[in-house]
Amino acid sequence: MKNKVFDIFSEICKVPRPSKHEEQISRWLQDFAVSHGIECVADEAMNVIMRVPATPGYEDHEGVILQAHMDMVCEKNGDVQHDFMRDPIETYIDGEWLKAKGTTLGGDDGIGISMALAAITDSDLPHPAIECLFTVDEETGLTGAMKLQDGMLRSKRLINLDSEDDGQIFIGCAGGIDTLAKMHYEPVSVSEAVCQRSGLCSVSPQGGLLAVKLRVSGLLGGHSGDDINKGRANANQLIVWFLARIWPQTDIQLASINGGNLRNAIAREAEAVLTVPMSYKEQIRIEWNHFVAQMEGVFGEVEKDMRLDLETCDMLDTFIPSDKAYRLVMALCECPHGMIAMSKEMPGLVETSTNLASIKMKEGYIEINTSQRSSIEASKHHLKWAVEQALSLACDEVTHGDGYPGWAPNPNSPLLEVVKKAYTDLFKAEPKVLAIHAGLECGLFLEKYPYLDMVSIGPQMYGVHSPQERLSIPSTERCYNWLCQTLKSL
């Protein structure tokens, strides 16, 4: 596969770049600029800005910013040994798709960087003055965009290269906010756990205890914005639904519960370890089999590789106190997840959603991460309060992140008209103009540079934020040609 964009992307895949750990990729970008004689500055946040002068004949044209983010979501399959802080991403070609071996690919947004770098190092491409803005930590906090200083950017037009849909131009995005909850507790021993009589169970332990592990795996997961309305299962929900189902039937002692990983990814895997009375041994398997059948009926058409496993396991030494464990399960059941409302203005666009992203056992507490999105600011805040109220049923600490603004669509954008015409001239078809239910950095750029005229484009990708991520090779080639045609036309 000989192509300048993919040659650059191949080099980027060798550089570790987890969110909040962009030191190596920031340095790589600066070295790239130096080696090509390109003006380059890096700010305190490690954002990198490259500046390329206009080519002959374009000196009096308004400049443009090409923008992408450095970091990538680091997800891997449970059976894959990969250290994202050290190991390169191993890629392979499957037909017309570029994929990674058991991990996220990092096409989001490594391919955006690659297209921008290919464009500014193409000596045959005529263009106005170009600024390349490469930001850090887009995936877990939009930190780079938030810390971008006033006055760093000179141009009034910006093309964001962080979209994932072929032949589509995005002119707006949702705002978002995170809700984080913690339930602190003092672990108890097996004997203490059994002696704690909460009054919430109907059957007493008899004949000893049976330790079992519940595990959900093989789910699609995906982006908590783009994929939230696709009917995919959330592994965290499946675990707590089953626990809530059997809790009234017997004495349960919950030893551990873990699921999900990143706030902007739908949970693909989750597990819980618990004990039940030995007398409940057969019944829990019956209940599990019924539950599996029900979940296959609900999600089977979408989740083709869903696995729900129950197995006996070794007894753990400590447990969550019974009353707290019960309240935790009920709070998680009450916590909303998924699509909440569709846009009335733009058919097919999710307006409001929330993601029950992760449940993590820490020393002395359980941490729950969620994220809320909406293109309507009031709806975003109403939803964060609903999540807070649900989690407060169990958690003694609930906090919210700073949040980030949405990007209001401007259908009369002059830049939009240029980008649309470039597409039509190349492909003899009309591109779709849409807004996206995901957080792009554009909303934050507008806060600092309210005069910016912006659009977002990108090649076709599926399964982003999951090990199923794949990037269309022909779509990438089309998108790069489209970008080049746009630069010629500006």
List each language-model region with its residue ranges.
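Acidic/His- and Gly-rich active-site-bordering loop/insert found
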Residues: 3-97
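A short beta-alpha structural unit
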Residues: 10-14, 273, 307-318, 357, ...
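Active-site metal-coordination/substrate-binding segment of hydrolases
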Residues: 58-134, 138-140, 145-156, 322-325, ...
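Acidic, glycine-rich active-site loops and adjacent beta-strand->loop/helix elements
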Residues: 70-72, 133-141, 162-165, 220, ...
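Midchain, well-structured core segments that form catalytic/ion-binding scaffolds
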Residues: 94-99, 103, 139, 147-372
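His/Asp/Glu-rich mid-to-C-terminal helical/loop segments that flank catalytic regions of hydrolases
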Residues: 232-249, 277-281, 326-333, 341, ...
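Active-site-adjacent substrate-binding region
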Residues: 241-257, 409-452
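Zn-dependent metallopeptidase/amidohydrolase metal-coordination segment
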Residues: 344, 351-364, 429-485
